[in-house]
């Protein structure tokens, strides 16, 4: 059994504070895979040769699938855990910068469904990827420029409706002020040492500058940006690298969940099904043997859960509410907004009981619509039995969300048991 030290919150915080975007997160995971397993990268546009060992595949820099294979156990089922790498936010329009009233302000495009008001009056960083030309070749660099700007509120004296449900106009009211001296694009290129004529494109998103913090009188909670769903990504990664390689375990990190997953690097693509099939092709399994194997496999989809808010208890079903500090949550929906079935729930609950892991169940109130996640999409795409779980949080899609450290540890323990023992 792995030492309890690997469950310490500082490792969780390291991922949160060093992964402001999916690009950074995938790089972070890649480094861990190489450090722990000397994992070998495979590419989708090349032939695969697989022997016993650890491998990973990246898709467009923001999605990744890692797998461990023992060729002697090539007929055994896949044990899959999946999460998403993206979070709601404000993407920079790199060439939509204006200078008004002596300051440069930068227009954005809203990604996903953030709680807009939480972005106001916060120290903002800018992170992502920049592509440029060098010696006629296309190169790229990841950036994370801290404290680059702010979206200031209008003073209450000039906006008396600010505390009465004021609605922010995304184009006019969410402009990020960055400087009085130079445009943000010029600042970025200067820091990277790139001439303007060599700039090609970028994918940049504003994030909070403040690092994650352990909070509360007893140090029970962790507040951070991007907990949805970097908490799920960390739980999978921690479990994957700290369990034995006796099983055919697979860690999946999809992008673009927050905008529907319908991209080549999202759950609503052939990425996972293609990787699973190509693994078995490389292992000389027949098509029928591959289908038999996938029908024996199991997928745990982990994403954030709405924790019951003490100030808004009427929003939750009192019999099916998710309490912070009371363990992993199984997500259920009559309309299959989540992939959980009674069969899958029974299997997971049995695994949890055998390993003394606390679990709870959430079903939304009948008059409150349920969200959804990658579970049902991945389930339909692969046909693999899937269950949706997660850890409860407050203020989902806020710039700063809050989770229970104890719940996160329980999620890691559950995934470790799954990777070690199956289901």
Swiss-Prot record:
**What are this entry's molecular-function GO terms?**
aminopeptidase activity; metallopeptidase activity; zinc ion binding
Residues annotated for Zn(2+) binding in this entry: 84, 157, 397
Q: Tell me which InterPro entries the record gives.
A: M18_aminopeptidase_2, Peptidase_M18, Peptidase_M18_dom2
Q: What GO biological process term is on the record, naming one?
A: proteolysis
Query: What sort of enzyme, by top EC class, is this?
Result: hydrolase
Query: Which keywords does UniProt give here?
Result: Aminopeptidase, Hydrolase, Metal-binding, Metalloprotease, Protease, Zinc
Swiss-Prot/TrEMBL cofactor(s): Zn(2+)
Q: What's its EC?
A: 3.4.11.-
Protein's UniProt keywords contain Zinc: yes
What SUPFAM superfamilies does UniProt report for this protein, alphabetically?
A: Aminopeptidase/glucanase lid domain (SSF101821), Zn-dependent exopeptidases (SSF53187)
Please give an example of a GO cellular component term from this record.
Answer: cytosol
Checking HAMAP family in the record gives: Aminopeptidase_M18_2 (MF_00467)
For this chain, the family text in UniProt reads: Belongs to the peptidase M18 family.
Which NCBIfam families would you find in this protein's record? PRK02813.1
Its name, as the record gives it, is: Probable M18 family aminopeptidase 2
Gene it is expressed from: apeB
